[in-house]
A protein has these predicted regions:
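Conserved acidic
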Residues: 1-236
Length: 236
């Protein structure tokens, strides 16, 4: 994923728009700012060669990050995430052993880790924070927005292709998730299935959910490469 951290930030592509950049008819030229310096004009082809040669990822707001070495913030997040996983395992272990006190303790610990994990990138936009950087804060939010909108778009595409229509089937969209009903696909595939039969509906929904998730994961590979210039990601 994007290696967002103060020391991995390389500069910013002015006027960057990933969808526009992918348009083959795009004749726009781009400039890159690095501190107070500006690197000339790049065509779409020249910019692509530049990004590949430098091995950098690009956020939706145009900020570039080196990909060859882990940044401080991603390293911290990985450490805290691994600790949360361990706390959750311990909470489950002690719960199964009947030790409620220790189970509750580690459950609280894992929850605190979750709060810290969710807060780190958000606090980048706080002016009193040690690593305050508007570009980095915007890189997180704009790329997240772009990814969730992309998710909605390709999920609708999946539904539209199978149902042969152009409807928007998204029920709700959040900062990190989209909600869809599997019922339209169930009715199309199993017209004689009684949707009130919970057992059969559950099996049908799980099958569809697995298929849609696999489709989305392939889409995320495309998003990472084309929108962010990344070969590896954790968008799944």
């Amino acid at each position: 994923s994007l290696n967002i951290s103060p020391e991995t930030k390389l500069g910013k592509i002015e006027g960057w728009n990933p969808e526009e950049f992918l348009d083959k008819s795009n004749k726009k030229t781009y400039s890159i700012t690095q501190g107070k310096s500006t690197l000339g004009k790049f065509t779409e082809t020249e910019l692509k060669k530049f990004l590949d040669s430098k091995n950098v990822g690009v956020a939706t707001n145009g900020v570039m990050y080196r990909s060859d070495k882990d940044g401080l913030l991603p390293a911290l997040l990985r450490k805290w995430f691994d600790e949360r996983v361990e706390y959750r395992k311990l909470s489950k272990k002690f719960h199964e052993e009947g030790d409620r006190e220790k189970s509750d303790y580690f459950d609280r610990r894992q929850y605190l880790q979750k709060v810290v994990l969710n807060s780190l990138y958000g606090v980048l936009g706080l002016s009193v924070f040690r690593f305050y950087d508007v570009d980095n804060a915007e890189a997180v939010t704009t790329t997240g927005q772009s990814l969730i909108k992309f998710t909605k778009k390709i999920t609708n595409s999946y539904y539209n292709k199978e149902l042969n229509d152009t409807k928007d089937y998204c029920i709700y969209i959040d900062t990190d998730s989209v909600f869809y009903s599997a019922t339209p696909l169930v009715k199309k595939r199993f017209p004689n299935l009684n949707i009130k039969d919970e057992d059969k509906m559950s099996k049908a929904i799980l099958k569809i959910a697995d298929e849609v998730q696999s489709y989305l994961n392939n889409g995320y590979d495309y998003f990472a490469k084309k929108f962010c210039n990344l070969d590896k990601h954790r968008f799944d």
